[in-house]
Amino acid sequence: MQGNDSHWLPKHITDSSRMTGFSQPISGASRRRKLVLLATGGTVASTWSNAQGSMQDYSVTLAVEDLLPAISKSGSLADFHCVNLFSLPSHDIDCDHLLKIGQVSQAWLDNPEVDGLIITHGTDSLEETAYFLNLTIRSEKPVVVTGAMRPADHPSPDGPANLMGAVAVASSPMASGKGVLVVLNDGILEAGSCSKQHTTGLSAFDGMWEAQIGEVIGGNVLFRSAPTRRHTATSEFTISGLIGFPTVDVIYDHQSARSALYEASVASGCAGIVVAGMGNGSLSAGARVGALLAKE
């Protein structure tokens, strides 16, 4: 029903002659969207490691093909090409993985046979990946990032519904030109504003109302607004030619903060420091000392 391509590297993906792995239509339709499902791991592709079902005791065990039956049961709007890029919990995704996700995504989107892209991802760092892609991907095609709060073998998993919602959005012409979108719990969020607000709840991303620009209601896609900031095709950044990232540390300021963390960052060779400061950009005395040391 679905195609695989172990050659996910851009030099292979950009060859349109390799685009022979799309699934056959699940039900009758004259024009189905051709979507790439790019898997990176996360809870959506995880199963519990023991019978007790601990909230933390599960691991990534499923390929993206294993998630497709849930879509076929409801009738799909698209044909799929599956790419298993990683099988990682998202707290283990680093800058090298992030760069690879961006490069592979861009290569697929550049293929004229592809109508849109869905990325399955763990929710712990989903917002970082979505935001990075929103700044660096050059395409007006729909790009949707989705995941799950519950593992696939949970008695009531949310992954299938999230994936079906992602398919509906990625298949919708209305999603074109809106940048990278996050689809979870029937909400459509813009990547530039979304943030995980709850550790375990199904509505973990729902608290950022300013980020929610639409909904998936009964399989129908409804947009109420559109992102206003530059993104994707109009972004000042691009994935093209990017080969790595400088090391930048994030240091939180707080009462009685010390300058030692700034000194350690500089000594370790970081290229920059982002200070997560207090209201109106205020810094504690220790942070001011550390920032001045780092600036020298």
List PLM regions with ranges.
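Accessory alpha-helical/coil subdomains and C-terminal extensions
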Residues: 31-34, 38-44, 60-74, 190-280
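Proline-centered loop/turn at the N-terminus of a beta-strand
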Residues: 34, 116, 141-144, 179
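Short glycine/serine/threonine-rich phosphate/pyrophosphate-binding segments
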Residues: 46-47, 124-130, 159-163, 259, ...
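Short acidic, glycine-rich surface-loop motifs adjacent to enzyme active sites
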Residues: 111-126, 268-280
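Short Gly/Thr/Asp-enriched flexible loops that form oxyanion-binding sites at enzyme active sites
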Residues: 119-141, 283-292
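Internal gly/pro-rich beta-alpha loop/helix module
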Residues: 145-218
